[in-house]
Structure formats: structure tokens, C-alpha cells
């Protein structure tokens, strides 16, 4: 990535050989047992597959020279089941049996959501036939209890650590799952996080993911967060693709832009839209079209994404018409 920075932005406004991007979003870079790294085992380190902390610091330095801000994925909805906090809590509960846990003996028990009932979305604690834990995505991603004050202090410390490393902000994963099936509660937690971050660094940029419909994710702007990814325009059935395919009139694009300005602005007058056309969870944009006009359609779709207000995001390779679909690793 460091070697390709001049392709992203060479820092010279007089040249035209770079993309001219002023920000980079890094998907999870922290140690994790998975290929996608959304299940973190250490929030204070760099996964060896990507390099070292020294490499990261060099990246920040070189980006600063070019006027590029770096934001990183911060996954606080859940950790890896291999995280020391979770492993210690599970070991404690397995030894405890049917007795009630003591937070003085093991405070990490309250970092997660444990129960003696196998509730929906819960998996069995290893080594125990009594205890279960919430893991909505899958058993290897135990959900945090984001109401726990000690955990919140840990998250604040993590934010401090990465600000000290020079990051300009964070992308927040799966915010609608902070409290699953409870939009007001998830918004409340997002409000806490946003306020905490802005007190530390007022110019920090925060963008969050809530993969749902526009009427639902617009409500998260009540938290005061800068941006929510604008899913309504993205993917193969989004507004952009449907206009480019001819399934919708071009006027639908402009009308929708006017509508979201009113909708988002009603929740947060200072919002910054975060349009994107495709991402790591979707097929590549170049695969949305077929036939002799597909290259032109791909270019037009990319242009419509960049024409939107706010901070447009471009998934790497989209500027080249890169293809890929199916498994996440192929995207």
C-alpha cells in the first residue's frame, strides 16, 4: 500500500496521474484468526499478515505528506472467541458450574452477554453444559455487552491508542447489531461512542455501517455521527445500477438525492453523506452489466457515485473495472 500511495494521491494538485483521493479506509488490520479480520484478538496490534506496527506508522507518515487521512475499521460489536477477555470469561464460567458469577473474580464475564438459557443467537460456552453466550454472526464472534462501563473504558483506551498512531477516524461495523433488533438502544450506544470520540478529537471522521433500508439507517444520524454508508444507491439492485441499466428513469437518481438530503438532514443537519457503489460484501460493479455497452455502463455508474454529495467511497479496483464475485475472498 505504501508503494501505491502516489497512485492514490501523489500530493501534487498539478498532476493528473493519481486518483486524487484524500482518504483511505483500511478494513480490519488488527490480529484475527480469519481472512476478513472482523473477529479481533488484540485491539492494540497489527496482524502479521499485513505487516508490523512500524509499517503502519510509516504508512501514516507517508499519507500525511500527501494530504491523505487514514480511517480504520473498529469492530466493537463483538470480538473473536480467541480474544483473551472472552477466553478468561469462558474458563471462569466453565469452572463455576451452576453458581452465579462474581464480577470481582472475573470482570470479563460482563464484557459479553452470557445466559443459562440457550436464547436465540446464543452458543454454548466451551467446557460448560450450563452457560451460553450471544454470538449473532457466528459462534466465533461473541457479542460485547456495550452497556458495561469497564468495557467502554477499554474501548475509549483503544480509541486513544489509534489516535496516538495518527488515524483520522474510524469506520464502525454492524452498528445495528450493537443491541440486536433494538434500533433506539443501538442508536443510544452509537451516540455514546460518537460523543466520546469527538471529545477526544473534534475533527475525527466517523462513518458507520447499517446494512438495512434507507428509512432505518437514516435514523442512526440521530446519534450525531458524521456519516452512514448510503446503501440505497449501492449494489446490483441499488438506485445507481437500476438507472444505468435503464430499469429506472435518470430523474429517479436526482429525485432520490433530494429526498435523502431532507431525510438525513432531519436527523442530523451536519451530516456528511457516504455514498458508495459496491464494497467487500457485494459483487464487483463491473459484473452488474452485460453486453457491448457494459464498459460504458460501468464508467457511468462510477461517475454517478462520485457526483453525489459528501464523502464518496470507492472500493479498491472499482476505478479499473475489476471483476469478482461469489466468495468474499474473490471480491
Regions found by a protein language model. Name each.
Residues 1-150, 164, 175-223, 231, ...:
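Acidic/aromatic-lined carbohydrate-recognition and catalytic surfaces
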Residues 1-8, 155, 159, 260:
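Generic hydrophobic alpha-helical segments
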